[in-house]
């Protein structure tokens, strides 16, 4: 998992509440267990028309937001069924941070395990971030995980809270496997000791 320290990029405003995981990545894209290639399916029912052509009105199809790295979204983002493909799709598209007032619990947890930072803010702060994001390509924001700050295009900062353990994992690029490997010296020492104490086993 790539480390997350500071992220700077365009923020796309998605002013929709209750965006569920089926909207983020529809079920037809769940047949694969590969984490790559899912960006094309991100919000596919909103991004594409029935004939397969792009919907020019959808935010991520607008020229200013095609390269968005941050998504500013409405309340209760990522609700609905459990599917780890949702953060995979965001990440494959290029989005590493989602900001909202609240998230679906399972989606929230899956984000941290896959290198995507979900940030909870107040409604007042979200409204300010929506205003900033609507500036288009001039809406560059900086997410400073170490300082726990969102810095807008005008230099103003919004503080956010994050669990210290999850912060540690993101900054150091540690997923579940990485966390286990951190303990490898202790695991090896235990196994060596066990072989000595239970040579008969």
UniProtKB/Swiss-Prot annotation:
Keyword annotations from UniProtKB, A to Z: Amino-acid biosynthesis, Branched-chain amino acid biosynthesis, Leucine biosynthesis, Lyase
GO cellular component, one term: 3-isopropylmalate dehydratase complex
Pathway involvement of the protein, from the record: Amino-acid biosynthesis; L-leucine biosynthesis; L-leucine from 3-methyl-2-oxobutanoate: step 2/4
E.C. number(s) listed in UniProt: 4.2.1.33
Keyword Amino-acid biosynthesis: yes
GO molecular function annotations of the record: 3-isopropylmalate dehydratase activity
Top-level EC class as recorded in UniProt: lyase
Signal peptide (from-to): none
Gene Ontology terms: biological process: L-leucine biosynthetic process
Chemical reaction(s) catalysed: (2R,3S)-3-isopropylmalate = (2S)-2-isopropylmalate
Entries under Pfam families matching the protein: Aconitase_C
Family per similarity comment: Belongs to the LeuD family. LeuD type 1 subfamily.
PANTHER family hit by this protein: 3-ISOPROPYLMALATE DEHYDRATASE SMALL SUBUNIT, 3-ISOPROPYLMALATE DEHYDRATASE SMALL SUBUNIT 2-RELATED-RELATED
HAMAP family, per database record: LeuD_type1 (MF_01031)
Quaternary state and interactors: Heterodimer of LeuC and LeuD.
The protein's role, per its UniProt record: Catalyzes the isomerization between 2-isopropylmalate and 3-isopropylmalate, via the formation of 2-isopropylmaleate.
Name of the protein in question: 3-isopropylmalate dehydratase small subunit
Organism of this sequence: Rhodopseudomonas palustris (strain TIE-1)
Classification of source organism: Bacteria, Pseudomonadati, Pseudomonadota, Alphaproteobacteria, Hyphomicrobiales
